[in-house]
Regions:
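Signature of the first transmembrane helix
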Residues: 12-72, 76, 246-268
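Short runs within selected transmembrane alpha-helices of multi-pass transporters and secretion channels
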Residues: 68, 137-155, 163-174, 196-212, ...
Length: 451
């Protein structure tokens, strides 16, 4: 990051931040997309098992990932204020938090997975796939969370193009392992949907090794001597990250949990509905990379300017991100509505699943459009370290609005599984309105204080 003096310079810098982040997010989500696509081609039962397992681990990972995002605005504001001496200590505390979160997730899986699957009453064959898929995924759990600390540190320094290159490399590894292990190619065993778990684990270790090399050898990062001058846990730094990260993690958890809960509600309608629903979720997740990347770039750009006490410039970056988000929302709608048949056929050869995907897409496109407008606002607020209100808005919108509507309508014969999507759509509309109000308030408050 560096100071800019005109709107065009800010736009160019924002695009330079956003573009590599977008490609990075596409690669991260692309691994899941490919896994769902290939597993769907293998069998509907395997897809149902992998989809259920994915919904379960995603629920916990999203919370952990969001919590670890607390490091980003801290480092961005320190760089803006040119106070970098404490950055190495902050990175080490991020490692300690990541390790603790990984241990908690692992213990929950060991003791809670089988009882939960029994409660869901998933088909026995799909249950077996789900359990083995999650066991394979667990091999990459620790590096998956360690990488979040490393990547957030790299991105905070504006080195997003390096993150892009690393994650694209791991994406290639993921695709290769998925294809080889699901179908049994290149001398590897054919293990169906379980291969998707090994694919993720392999990608996680690839990411960790490459990001570790990055912080060891890049000129802007090697001065921090990560892995060389180890720092013990320091509560004041851990507390600062958790004070910012826990509200972020909780707010993202509330949003992500509605997808997992929605997926689990779909289990009661059979494997075909689960497969169709997860296919549409995989498709919407691909488009979610765009607003999410805008949000992440906004956190860095806004946080940098706030750290330098240039509040008007921070507002200009927020306007750039919001206009870009609206343009993306329009493009998402236009593309999806003109390609619904092709998109539906992409995921399955089963006629029943195809028809369900086609109908779910009508809801999914509007969900993606409204989410594209609301998500960047969260990134702007994180740049101001205004994270507690994001927590409350997410709680109200996703659990206070989505969950009851989805549950009630899903149990209504007139709506069934489509009621779940109505609840999802209602939640992002409410969240977008509330985030818009809060962003306007906090920005005008900052300008008033400076004046």
């Amino acid at each position: 990051m560096y100071q800019t003096y005109s709107i065009l310079q800010k736009l160019w810098l924002f695009i330079k931040l956003f573009t590599p982040m977008c490609i990075t997010q596409f690669s991260l989500v692309g691994g899941t997309f490919i896994a769902i696509f290939l597993t769907g081609q293998y069998s509907t039962i395997d897809l149902a098992g992998v989809a259920t397992g994915y919904n379960l681990w995603l629920l916990f990972y999203i919370f952990a990932q969001g919590t670890l995002m607390g490091i980003t605005p801290i480092i961005a504001q320190l760089l803006g204020a040119k106070k970098t001496d404490s950055i190495p200590t902050i990175v080490y505390q991020g490692f300690y938090i990541a390790t603790t979160l990984a241990l908690i997730i692992l213990l929950i899986g060991v003791f809670g997975l089988v009882p939960l699957l029994n409660f869901l009453n998933l088909e026995p064959a799909a249950t077996a796939v789900c359990i083995n898929y999650l066991k394979a995924f667990a091999l990459g759990l620790f590096p998956l969370l360690w990488v979040n600390t490393l990547r957030n540190t790299v991105d905070s320094h504006g080195l997003t193009h390096y993150s892009m290159a690393i994650v694209v490399t791991s994406f290639v590894v993921n695709v290769f392992l998925n294809y080889s292990l699901i179908f049994g190619h290149f001398g590897l065993p054919e293990i169906g949907g379980v291969g998707a778990g090994y694919g993720i684990a392999g990608a996680c270790w690839t990411n960790f090794i490459l990001f570790s090399a990055m912080v060891l050898f890049h000129p802007k990062l090697k001065r921090y001597r990560i892995y060389k001058d180890w720092v013990r846990p320091k509560w004041q730094y851990i507390r600062e990250q958790l004070q910012i990260g826990l509200p972020i993690g909780s707010s993202i958890f509330f949003e992500a949990s509605i997808f997992s809960i929605a997926g689990l509600l779909m289990v009661h309608f059979g494997s075909a509905v689960v497969a169709a629903h997860q296919s549409v979720i995989a498709f919407t997740n691909v488009f979610y990379c765009l607003p999410l990347s805008i949000a992440m770039a906004s956190t860095i750009a806004v946080g940098y300017e706030v750290g330098a006490e240039r509040h008007k410039e921070a507002i200009q970056y927020s306007y750039i991100s919001r206009v870009l988000a609206i343009v993306i929302a329009i493009l998402i709608c236009a593309f999806t509505f003109t390609h619904m048949e092709s998109i539906s056929a992409l995921f399955t050869n089963d006629e029943e699943v195809y028809n369900l995907i086609y109908r779910f897409l009508g809801y999914g496109v509007f969900f993606s459009a409204f989410d594209a407008i609301g998500t960047p606002l969260q990134g702007i607020l994180r740049g101001y370290k205004d994270v507690k209100i994001v927590f409350y808005i997410s709680l109200i919108s996703y659990w206070g609005v989505c969950f009851p509507i989805s549950y009630i309508l899903a149990n209504n014969p007139n709506y069934g599984p489509f009621g779940v999507w109505i609840g999802l759509l209602a939640s992002v509309i409410v969240a977008g309105i509330l985030f818009t109000i809060r962003t306007w308030y906090i920005q005008h408050k900052q300008v008033h204080i400076k004046a």
